[in-house]
């Protein structure tokens, strides 16, 4: 019989925990080995047996080649596989093996089948990593009801005072990832205000520091690099992890690994003492790497450390005294320690499961997307549709247009990140919209819609509003951000902000110049008899000047803008002449379409093709006369999307 309970799972890098609501409270489930946490380790033995959890970890020294650990660090990587004999496994498949054990152990504990689960992920996981986690759950046989950010789940587990409003900082340092989140709490509402992190920082890195210290010392003394022997390296791993744990409660630890290597003269032993002070000096750079994300999260939330009411530590790595001291230094207060940091996330996941099943009815969780989402537009710019730290679920739409005449298809490229240039962010996916009726550049209206669900998973749709054709894409598991890319994304965005902005301004100026040239050609062709010879000569001279600047690859923003404005001023005279003609004829609509949608233009004025505001209405509302005026027709609506994607200025809609 299937239980209606929803299992809460903390799928960790080094250890996992799982819990369920019992009698109104979350309860950690003891696994089949009688323990409250399960090592996230999978092994394959010579006789084909598959081991998961503690049995896999216990035999790692004897079987290092076929023992897989810390697979979470590779979730969402398209090309990453684990080779075991003649077989290959993806990170999702290995994670599913861990989840299958969790499912079996939970069912044995509860005496019922468990079909549904809430699984947690680091707050800074990108879309591909979230999708990969969801896939792993489904491979394991779960209906994944929700993907929840780990710091948010932890905040729910701490049982903070529901009656008073408070701001909480969650510092989550696990085995392989680091997250920090700022939440506003009150009345049972858990609202994430900002989040940041480093997906390539965790307790494993502290272990590696000890391993390198021991291996370097041994190599210096004996001339043998233990890291080249898989079995010796696995013994070093286990010794380093044990030393790290001991140094959280002791000032010194001894490491003794007999027969770790051998020479012609006989076996060699490794004996070393490490003090806490030495350990902290070896790893000081690691704890410092948590400072930047913490300060950035506070800045994004608009808070100072004095605004924080409570600080919560999550993850086994926060037991290290050096970490606790750093957190207190960053926040100015002592963190709460009333919940086991290894269990907090799993307990919180169970609470969220209780919310979804109806067992808990006084909690509302409002999470956020950690990175901005958008598409590539003309000139290679990144056009954001959803900003980072936006509460999810959410949906956002923008209308774009084509940049070439008679374009019948467009390529929509979806990116995630904080850089102004699309290629410098992470490409999540791409798809084509075809069947667009041939039309002048700037005429088609293509609406692009981004939707992020409660799990943080992205769906993008593009629809040609003229033909009704539409295509969409759900970003599936695949090659996601590398650990290093995610770690550096915010830092790079800040470092290159000024450079990116200058590039954006220059690209926009060039786009505006090209659009104004296109508009000028259209106006002259469509109004050949209405433009006198002197004005035509002036406009053509300005067009020649602007073409020369556009063709100059070294032309800067000011040169492009100056030449564009000169042509725009000349184009204004067409509008004046036509207005005078219309006034004289008593027919105000005679040439409005050609003049650029003057006074009553459709959305976007003349559908200006310049990014950052299609419509390009010139001074006085003369649609189409100013820089950015585009090729759309008066009253036909906004201008829309293409492989070059040009943005629409919705403000012009108000002119109708």
UniProtKB/Swiss-Prot annotation:
Q: Which CDD domains match?
A: ASKHA_NBD_HSP70_DnaK-like
Give the compositionally biased regions (Acidic residues).
523-532, 636-656
- What Pfam families does this protein map onto? HSP70 (PF00012)
The signal peptide annotation in the UniProt record is: none
Top-level division of the source organism's lineage: Archaea
Task: Specify where the region named Disordered lies, as residue ranges.
Answer: 488-532, 579-656
Check the record and name the PROSITE patterns matching this protein.
HSP70_1 (PS00297), HSP70_2 (PS00329), HSP70_3 (PS01036)
Q: Which GO terms describe its molecular function?
A: ATP binding; ATP-dependent protein folding chaperone; unfolded protein binding
For bias type Basic and acidic residues, the affected ranges are 492-513
Gly residues bias: start-end ranges: 584-635
Q: Which InterPro entries match?
A: ATPase_NBD, Chaperone_DnaK, Heat_shock_70_CS, HSP70_C_sf, HSP70_peptide-bd_sf, Hsp_70_fam
Q: Which UniProt keywords apply?
A: ATP-binding, Chaperone, Nucleotide-binding
- Entry similarity comment: Belongs to the heat shock protein 70 family.
User: What does the UniProt record say this protein does?
Assistant: Acts as a chaperone.
Name by which UniProt lists this protein: Chaperone protein DnaK
Which species is the source of this protein? Natronomonas pharaonis (strain ATCC 35678 / DSM 2160 / CIP 103997 / JCM 8858 / NBRC 14720 / NCIMB 2260 / Gabara)
